[in-house]
Each structure stands twice: as structure tokens, then as C-alpha cells.
Amino acid sequence: MLSEAKDTSELMVDLAYAAVYFGDPAMAEEVDELEQRLSELVHEMRAVCVLAARSPRDADAMASVLQVVGAIERIGNAAVDIGRIVTHRLGIPRALVADLSRAEEVSHRVRVREGSAMAHRTLADVELPVEVGMRVVAIRRDRDWVTDMEGEHVLLPGDVLFLQGAAAGIAELRVLAGAPEWEPPEVTEDAAVSDLDRAIDALVEMKNVSEVAVGLAYSALVLRDQGLAAEVSHLEDRLDEMKERLELWVLRAAHEHLDPSPFRGLVHLAQAAEEIGDAAEQMVWLVQEGEALHPILALALGAADEVVVRVPVAPGSPADGRALAPLRLETETGFYLLAIRRGGRYLYRPRPSVVLRAGDELLATGPDEGHHLLAEMCGYTLIEDDETGAEELVPSGGPPPSR
């Protein structure tokens, strides 16, 4: 239930931002439907935790689960608030939609054409997260929506796929779907930067930072890493500061326009991004305070659709000495790089120009089927124990692990 709740809350956020990007009320209503399922899961998990706590020691361990459950619920509620910007027509400046195409993870939609490489094939067969670095968050077939896709789901001509991921994979994605070439929304460049421009730039940054904070928070829980927990708290502080500046810029911009109504959505989006950051900090509080973590947390978070992995860079590996841009991690492996650990410090959201070195540790999140590709890029082979199912990194060309 915990892994399903995590996946559901992340799907809700993806759909909510996509609804804003495409101005699609039907997609926003799907977020409300998912919120009902998330509420049921949260209620059931709380009941299970109460029943399982039979001693003070059990209560301490279950308290950590309840803390994470509450944080996941907050993320889902923030997604609902984002969706309401569309359903309640609060207004969004068109410049924001164009700027969202420059976010670290972008929304895209494409229709599957007859005769294309996707038509009549399963999602598992197409392997979009690995092939193009984008994941399907929803499918619209005629008037029906599908949000709980399994690997055996067959794509049919006419299906409209809504995806989230690296913008670099859009061109290849459209080739696979048989769709025409896509031109991204134009971002008008103006020498004079207005308060509205500043607010929009800050909001896109808040979206990026809040999503990274959640990824790092789950990583901190799985790895029990104090350093990651501290980074999450730092990011949450940045979100607070950005929200305060954004509110000032929006007020100034509204004063200069006859109709300030399109600016209401900006304030709501900023509040939702900050709430997501607060939820991330709520999770890492457990790590920072040294609270006992129930083993189910690591198991459940590791069984989610997207897993958190830590892979070191081996000397002489394909990644050693290369910049992130030409490596194309997201499109080649499907994994999104959250941070690099170098010399005991974390470099989160590294720029494409950052050059990887032997000894760096990559902290990334993505589909489990791409884990071996990331390992190979870093000079390792991923070996799975037949009996326990545990995975181990072995240097490429090295001896097999002892059993």
C-alpha cells in the first residue's frame, strides 16, 4: 500500500502539471479521481499501523511509517490544488506555459499513428523510459482515461499518450509514434526583464526544486543518509525564500496590468510547490532526528515504480571523465540524476557541463529496468541473487560475487 501511495501521489503531481501545461480540465479531474484512491490508501495504512503497534517499541517504529504516510498525503493534496487552477479557471499567463517547456522534467503528449513503431505493441516492449527518457503517466483512448498502466498494456492507433521526462527525448518519441515534427512553445526574449518574468522564472525553479527535494527525501529514507536529509532541508528553505520573492513580484506585476486575474494561478502554483517541499522535509525529519525507521519503508520505497539507486563511477568507465550532456543519462538509461556525491559533499541538480570523475557516486531515480544500463555506464555489472533477489554491483570484467 505504501509503494502504491507513493506512486499515486507522484502520478497526481505529473498529471496536475500536465493539466496546467495543456490547459486540460479532464486531466485535472483525473487528479481528483486519484485523490480519492490516495485517501483510501492513507486511511487503510493508518488503520494497519494502529493495529500493528502492540508495544511501545512497535509504536515508535510505526510512527515513522505514519510520518511518511502523512507526507505522501500532503503531496497528493498539493497536486489537487495545482489541478484546481485549471478546473476553477484561476488563470495562468501563457508565458508560464512556454517557460515550463524549459523545466528539467517536461510534459508532452503524442498520438500513436497506425503503422508506427508503437502501434499494437506493449509498453514493456516499447520501453519508453529507457529508449527516450520519458515515462507514460496517462493514456486517453477515445473518451476514457487510463492511469494505472501495466507493462502488458497494448498501445493502439489513436491512443493519446501523456508523458513526463527529459525534453531531449521528445524528438525520438515522436518518431516512434509516427507523429509530425514538434516545435516547442516560443519563449519571447525581452531585454527588459519585468516582474512577471521574474515571477515565472522563479515558479519554474520552484517546480524543479520541489521535485528534487521529494526525490532526495525518498533517497534519504532508503539510504538513511544524514547528508541527503540536510540537503532537503536546505532546498525547503530555498523554496520558502523563492515563494516570498514571487509573491512580491506578482503583486507588482498585477499593479501594472488592467486585468490581474491571470496572476492568481501563479500564487496557487507557488503555494503548491512550497507544500511539496514541506512534505519532503517532513519525511527527512525522521533521519535528521535519528528516529527508528521501520524496515517496511525501505522495502516499500524500493518496490515503487521508480527506484532510488546509488552507483559509483569506476575508473576507466564510459562515464569517467565525461560531461553529463554527451552522456545523455536520462535518454540512455531512463534515470534522472538527483545528485552527485563527491568528496563527502552533495552536488544536487548538476548542470550538463559537470564532468564525472572516478569515485563520484551518482544518486538517481528511474525505472528498475534501466538500472543495469546505468550500472554499465559507470563500469559495473548488476548481478541479482537468485535466492534473495538482492542486487549487487560488480566491477565490469571482475570476478562474480561469492554466493
Give, region by region, the residue ranges found by the protein language model.
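Cytosolic, long alpha-helical scaffolding segments
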Residues: M1-R403
